[in-house]
């Protein structure tokens, strides 16, 4: 393995783990890093499989709760309501994402200006919503009404545009619909599980001929980096947003988006 390739794998893995579960768009950051830093050697297989590190991070943090939900599912009405609610929220983006997959990957993902613009727009919206005097009505993710699960799922469809952010769209949607800040982030975590697993499986199937055994050492580096970083983020994000809200992430998006647009004007 070349040292440059190892550094690329490590940096992209860290970037994936750091940004996947916060409302700043992990896809946007990785695509911009690839554009400006020339991270091309890792390839599509790498970009797909490092997501598995982030997926396993959230599964490990919520393992006991997920296992208990699985045990309670046959006989507990509230658990069934929550699991069905997650599936309802998952379906809109899954359907649209599958139908528009090729357009999203070949057109939208190839536009760094679009990514930067969406980072800026999303940052402004996140800052505005975080400053609104919203009165939370829903604090328990397992007791959301069915229509609320669907409404949050419709907001998640916005994240199919790179630079928007899956967690950002679901969190903003949840906040506007009356969900408390901590519960908004927590439900975004749960919704991430079927969404990321589905996207991972679909992308892996579409690119099944790309992966070779020679890629495995590089993928392992990115995978571990993504797992460890995402593990840290998932463990501490809920407490952070409960105390501080989402303004930090709004400013983060603005800075990255503006710097990205300026860089595109200078270097293309």
Swiss-Prot record:
UniProt KW keywords: Antibiotic resistance, Cell inner membrane, Cell membrane, Cell shape, Cell wall biogenesis/degradation, Hydrolase, Membrane, Peptidoglycan synthesis, Transmembrane, Transmembrane helix
InterPro entries given in the database record: UppP (IPR003824)
A Gene Ontology cellular-component term: plasma membrane
Pfam families, sorted: BacA (PF02673)
Gene Ontology biological-process annotations: cell wall organization; peptidoglycan biosynthetic process; regulation of cell shape; response to antibiotic
Location(s) in or outside the cell: Cell inner membrane
Similarity field: Belongs to the UppP family.
Matching HAMAP family: Undec_diphosphatase
Protein name, UniProt field: Undecaprenyl-diphosphatase 1
Lineage, highest ranks first: Bacteria, Pseudomonadati, Pseudomonadota, Alphaproteobacteria, Hyphomicrobiales
């Amino acid at each position: 393995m070349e040292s440059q390739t190892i550094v690329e794998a490590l940096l992209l893995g860290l970037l994936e783990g750091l940004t996947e579960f916060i409302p700043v768009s992990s896809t946007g950051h990785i695509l911009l890093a690839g554009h400006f830093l020339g991270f091309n050697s890792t390839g599509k297989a790498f970009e797909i499989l490092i997501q598995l590190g982030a997926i396993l991070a959230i599964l490990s943090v919520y393992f006991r709760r997920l296992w208990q939900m699985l045990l309670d599912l046959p006989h507990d009405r509230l658990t069934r309501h929550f699991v069905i609610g997650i599936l309802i929220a998952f379906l809109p983006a899954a359907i649209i994402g599958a139908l528009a997959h090729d357009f999203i990957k070949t057109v939208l993902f190839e536009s760094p200006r679009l990514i930067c613009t969406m980072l800026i727009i999303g940052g402004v919206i996140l800052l505005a919503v975080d400053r609104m005097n919203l009165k939370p009505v829903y604090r328990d993710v397992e007791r959301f009404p069915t229509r609320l699960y669907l409404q949050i799922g419709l907001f998640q469809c916005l994240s199919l545009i790179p630079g928007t952010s899956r967690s950002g769209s679901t969190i903003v949607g949840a906040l506007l619909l009356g969900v408390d800040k901590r519960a908004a982030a927590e439900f975004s975590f749960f919704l991430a599980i079927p969404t990321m697993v589905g996207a991972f499986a679909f992308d892996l199937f579409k690119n099944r001929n790309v992966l070779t055994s020679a890629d495995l050492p590089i993928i392992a580096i990115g995978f571990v980096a993504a797992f460890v970083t995402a593990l840290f983020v998932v463990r501490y994000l809920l407490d952070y947003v409960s105390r501080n809200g989402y303004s930090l992430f709004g400013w983060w998006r603005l800075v990255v988006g503006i710097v990205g647009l300026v860089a595109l004007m200078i270097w293309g």
